[in-house]
Amino acid sequence: MRHQLRVPLLSKPADQRKALLRALTTQLIREGRITTTKARAKALRNEAERMISLAKEGTLSARRRALGYIYDKKLVHSLFEKAQERYGERNGGYTRIVRTVARKGDNAQMAIIELV
């Protein structure tokens, strides 16, 4: 039964799900906006906000944790440089999810997730 299950499974084994979320988080931080399915966007929101919160913290341990999660080292450094000025006064809510039209092939609900 799914009682109290807080992690969205996304129909993938744990290793594939973690790799997918890491890749989506890296792409979102690099591009600022990506189009994906609604379920993936909701799962991605938690990870992206966690990385931005680490960047706002700005400590060495936070930087090392972000380097262990985000695939691109240069992207982590640029995130840590820009996060404090961009999100300094904001306490959470760094992303926005906007629903779009369903995907043509399988009618999956699509969404655009973007950094605010």
From Swiss-Prot:
Complexes and interactors: Part of the 50S ribosomal subunit. Contacts protein L32.
Protein name: Large ribosomal subunit protein bL17
InterPro entries the UniProt entry points to: Ribosomal_bL17 (IPR000456), Ribosomal_bL17_sf (IPR036373)
GO biological process: translation
Single GO term (MF): structural constituent of ribosome
Gene3D superfamilies, per the entry: Ribosomal protein L17
Pfam family, one: Ribosomal_L17
Keywords assigned by UniProt, alphabetized: Ribonucleoprotein, Ribosomal protein
Record GO cellular component, one term: cytosolic large ribosomal subunit
Family listed: Belongs to the bacterial ribosomal protein bL17 family.
Domain of life of the native organism: Bacteria
